[in-house]
């Protein structure tokens, strides 16, 4: 699970800012919202343009750089309000009671990309510019690394971290992640065969759980699925909404 992350000079976050998901002594939701001492989720509350979106952007950035985009335009993530001309993101995870820390730092002045992977206090990989040292692979020193991509991404694609079970489980966890932005409608899956489209979910699970959720939350309508109809490009073509007490079904 994600334990914490610290960002500096990234997007609108000028100063070092840490988001810590380790639980405190608050016990009201401990049975359902805490796992192994870490919160399962959190919510950011603040005024418009206060930086809420950019606080979670580092998570999408990490997943994009590892699984989706091979050549990143690092300078696009620099904070416009900072004179440092660099950003640094550090992510900490707890996987099978092992602590993993991964840092990405980009210095725009020298076009220098730095990566550092630490497992339970032991440096497993360290990259500075085009050179890297690794304890994950048989080959210990690498040269000529392209500046546009993460070296950790290449290590995983080439080795799948053979012989390092904790790192394998860490990447399985990351690849199971999904990004949903309800404001822009952007949805992203980073693993294989992970579709966020509603027709795939209904095909596999039906609509009973969805309607049960609507009942539990006190909504006065239900979904009706018409499998004989074409779902269409939106995925909603074979779904209708029926309000309680009204015979008419409304297409979604």
Each model region followed by its residue ranges:
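Conserved P-loop NTP-binding catalytic core
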Residues: 37-43, 47, 56-108
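Pre-Walker A-like glycine/lysine-rich segment at the N-terminus of P-loop NTPase domains
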Residues: 1-60
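Short, mixed charged/polar active-site loops
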Residues: 14-16, 99-101, 247-249
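Short polybasic amphipathic segments
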Residues: 87-92, 112-121, 232-246
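Short strand-coil-strand connectors
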Residues: 8-11, 94-98, 120, 244
């Amino acid at each position: 699970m994600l334990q914490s992350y610290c960002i500096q000079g990234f997007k609108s976050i000028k100063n070092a800012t840490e988001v810590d998901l380790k639980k405190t002594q608050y016990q009201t939701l401990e049975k359902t919202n805490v796992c192994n001492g870490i919160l399962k989720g959190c919510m950011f509350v603040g005024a418009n343009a206060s930086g809420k979106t950019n606080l979670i952007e580092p998570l999408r950035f990490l997943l994009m750089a590892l699984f989706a985009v091979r050549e990143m335009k690092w300078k696009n993530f620099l904070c416009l309000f900072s004179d440092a001309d660099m950003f640094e993101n550090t992510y900490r995870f707890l996987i099978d009671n092992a602590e993993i820390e991964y840092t990405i730092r980009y210095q725009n002045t020298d076009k220098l990309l730095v990566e550092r992977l630490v497992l339970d206090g032991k440096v497993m990989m360290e990259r500075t510019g085009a050179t890297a040292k690794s304890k994950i692979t048989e080959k210990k020193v690498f040269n000529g690394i392209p500046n546009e991509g993460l070296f950790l991404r290449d290590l995983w694609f080439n080795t799948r971290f053979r012989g390092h079970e904790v790192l394998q489980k860490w990447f399985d966890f990351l690849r199971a992640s999904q990004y949903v932005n309800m404001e822009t409608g952007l949805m992203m899956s980073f693993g294989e065969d992970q579709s966020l489209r509603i027709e795939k979910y209904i095909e596999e699970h039906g609509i009973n759980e969805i309607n049960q959720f609507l009942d539990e939350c006190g909504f006065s309508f239900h979904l009706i699925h018409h499998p004989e109809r074409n779902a269409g490009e939106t995925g909603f073509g074979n779904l209708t909404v029926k309000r309680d007490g009204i015979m008419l079904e409304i297409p979604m």
